[in-house]
From Swiss-Prot:
Residues spanning the membrane: 269-289
Residues with glycosylation annotation: 46, 64, 166, 191
Gene: GINM1
GO cellular component, one term: membrane
Protein name: Glycoprotein integral membrane protein 1
Spans within the Cytoplasmic topological domain: 290-330
């Protein structure tokens, strides 16, 4: 797969930032106040599916993408940086008759890939551009085809939104298209919606994600029969292992980001210390030369007199033994 050309992507980022914000980015003028409220983008993604009879059905998938307090939400589900694949309930509009959309609207379960990428605009500043792209993979278990991607650009500083906009580009030219689907992060954790409670009108067939508890019971309204409780499937060991590895990777990155500056500071001190000591020793040798080393013990010259060994028994040890025997006999 080929991704978007780097030149066109850089040009879009430059135009997005430079046109409305060139004054306060370059001259230091007062920045525009953040937008009031969290930006909400209800985008419609055009997709096509294949019917059972072989005909092509055109549909629109409606996704509500919001940004609030440094977090991106897709249909109230939090999405982190990278490519995340989520399955959620959303509004789907059939496009056979665009003049009467109410009769063609229905809720379905879609599987969608969401790309969230953060571009730092300036070094040492909290100003950054958040790019969001989406690709619909399935609708109610059926594969879909998508030609265009709606890209959302949000310019933020200190978690405050300065401006946001969106535009459409071909799927083949998007960053999301160049990233393999094998590296997608599967959104499987339950109860991560920013909304604490679900509307009482929601039935078991309308839950966004499955709960890991034994059953999920619905609130029975007057005049409405309860549905069969939905029994959830426990998370598989593979998903748990993936979550552990992802947590380990984040902890390792955090540890290395903390140790890396300390290591280089220590290395800098060592290099500066050794270099400085060598320079100081060289200067001392130049200005204070030393002819001899005081640390070495030197001895005075002494005349050596040769000593000649005198043999007291010139006849040898055998003669000495005979003399001793003679003396004994006497």
């Amino acid at each position: 797969m080929e991704g978007a050309p780097p030149g066109s992507l850089a040009l879009r980022l430059l135009l997005f930032v430079a046109l409305p914000a060139s004054g306060w980015l370059t001259t230091g003028a007062p920045e525009p106040p953040p937008l009031s409220g969290a930006p909400q983008d209800g985008i419609r993604i055009n997709v096509t599916t294949l019917k059972d009879d072989g005909d092509i059905s055109k549909q629109q998938v409606v996704l509500n993408i919001t940004y609030e307090s440094g977090q991106v939400y897709v249909n109230d589900l939090p999405v982190n940086s990278g490519v995340t694949r989520i399955s959620c309930q959303t509004l789907i509009v059939k496009n056979e008759n665009l003049e009467n959309l109410e009769e063609k609207e229905y809720f379905g379960i879609v599987s969608v890939r969401i790309l969230v990428h953060e571009w730092p605009m300036t070094s040492g500043s909290s100003l950054q551009l958040i790019v969001i792209q989406e690709e619909v993979v399935e609708i109610d278990g059926k594969q879909v085809q998508q030609k265009d991607v709606t890209e959302i650009d949000i310019l933020v500083k200190n978690r405050g939104v300065l401006r946001h906009s969106n535009y459409t580009l071909p799927l083949e030219e998007s960053m999301l298209y160049s990233i393999s689907r094998d590296s997608d992060i599967l959104f499987t954790l339950p109860n991560l919606s920013k909304k604490e409670s679900v509307s009482s009108l929601q039935t078991t067939s309308q839950y966004l994600i499955r709960n890991v508890e034994t059953t999920v019971d619905e609130d029975v309204l007057p005049g409405k029969l309860p549905e069969t409780p939905l029994r959830a499937e426990p998370p598989s060991s593979y998903k748990v292992m993936c979550q552990w590895m992802e947590k380990f990777r984040k902890d390792l990155c955090r540890f290395w980001s903390n140790v890396f500056p300390v290591f280089f500071q220590f290395l800098n001190i060592m290099v500066v210390g050794i270099t400085g000591a060598a320079v100081v020793i060289t200067i001392l040798k130049v200005f204070f030369p030393v002819s001899e080393y005081k640390g070495i013990l030197q001895l005075d010259k002494v005349d050596v007199i040769p000593v000649t060994a005198i043999n007291l028994y010139p006849d040898g040890p055998e003669k000495r033994a005979e003399n001793l025997e003679d003396k004994t006999c006497i």
